[in-house]
Design a protein with these regions (language model features):
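Flexible "cap/lid" loop of the alpha/beta hydrolase fold
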Residues: 100-108, 113-143
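Conserved HGGG/HGGXW glycine-rich cap/lid loop of the alpha/beta-hydrolase fold
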Residues: 7-63
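Acidic catalytic loop of the alpha/beta-hydrolase fold
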Residues: 213-218
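Catalytic active-site module of serine/aspartate enzymes centered on a nucleophile-bearing elbow/loop
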Residues: 233-265
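Active-site loop/oxyanion-hole signature of alpha/beta-hydrolase fold enzymes
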Residues: 39, 43, 52-93, 255
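Conserved alpha/beta-hydrolase catalytic His-Asp/Glu region
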Residues: 127-131, 145-201
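Short alpha-helix in the alpha/beta-hydrolase fold that links the catalytic acid
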Residues: 205, 219-226
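Short beta-strand/loop motif that positions the catalytic acidic residue
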Residues: 203, 209-211
């Protein structure tokens, strides 16, 4: 299990693909993990790119330290991880929570960012979104895995995907029981502080915005806010996909990323 201690935290990471290829970092969603969440992307994206998957602090196989988390702290952790791996610059991608980390990384570490890919993510938290995540926090505080599963799944996947993937979701329900609930709460509390729309005009890097058409939680209305703030960005609507577009429409998801990266110097 490869780990490195950086910025006071031990982070789990994986590297895939040619050692001399440009590096592409994938930042996970809130309760995703590097070891299992990118199963539909790893092979396709690592053919021509050095793919870096990792768990941020509080996630998966990385340390889950006590104390407050923030997107700024996650960005600092990622910068330290890249430095430890002797990676000067990278394409930075992130889905959902990982997209919020990616925004802050691009803002705070522009010299380390080759391009930016923001997927099913937000740059601000309005009251309706806050209430959804607060309902998750309520489940987490009660350490009720089944309630957390039931509260989150309808927001994370489209109805059609849920109907077609009962077995996959049953397995996922079991994994919810293994979550570190205090760490998940700290991640949610970090999310509540997201408020970067006014700074996005500072981003000069080539940017690609992707969003599932049926994403109910961080959908097109939030993606359009980001696109208005970064007018040079590409905008891609993934039709028929919910929030977890990397699982629901993996071929289109991968194709958009590869096409975007192919345009970069």
């Amino acid at each position: 299990m490869p780990t490195l201690e950086v910025n006071g935290v031990r982070l789990y990471y994986e590297l895939h693909g040619p050692e001399i290829a440009p590096v592409l970092v994938l930042n996970n969603g809130l309760i995703m993990s590097a070891a299992s969440s990118w199963v539909f992307q790893t092979a396709a994206l690592s053919k021509d790119y050095r793919l870096l998957l990792y768990d941020c602090r509080g996630q998966g196989q990385s340390d889950h330290p006590e104390g407050a988390y923030s997107m700024e702290l996650h960005a600092d952790d990622l910068a330290a991880l890249l430095e430890a791996l002797d990676i000067d610059r990278a394409h930075i991608a992130g889905i959902s929570y990982g997209g919020e980390i990616a925004q802050v990384f691009a803002l705070n570490y522009p010299q380390k960012t080759r391009s930016l890919i923001l997927i099913d993510t937000v740059s601000e938290v309005d009251e309706s979104l806050r209430l959804v995540i607060q309902s998750w926090v309520d489940c987490v505080e009660a350490e009720n895995a089944v309630a957390f599963f039931n509260a989150s799944v309808p927001w994370n996947f489209s109805p059609r995907w849920i109907e077609a993937n009962a077995a996959v979701l049953e397995d996922a329900k079991e994994r919810y029981k293994l979550l570190d609930f205090p760490a998940v709460k700290r991640l949610c509390e970090a999310f509540f502080k997201v408020n970067y729309t006014s700074r996005l005009e500072e981003i000069d890097d080539p940017t690609c915005i992707m969003v599932g058409e049926l994403d109910l939680i961080k959908g097109p209305r939030f993606a359009k806010i980001i696109h208005r703030a970064i007018p040079h960005a590409e905008y891609h609507l993934i039709k028929g996909a919910g929030h977890a577009s990397c699982w629901e429409k993996p071929e289109e998801f991968n194709a958009i990323i590869l096409d975007f990266l192919a345009k970069q110097p």
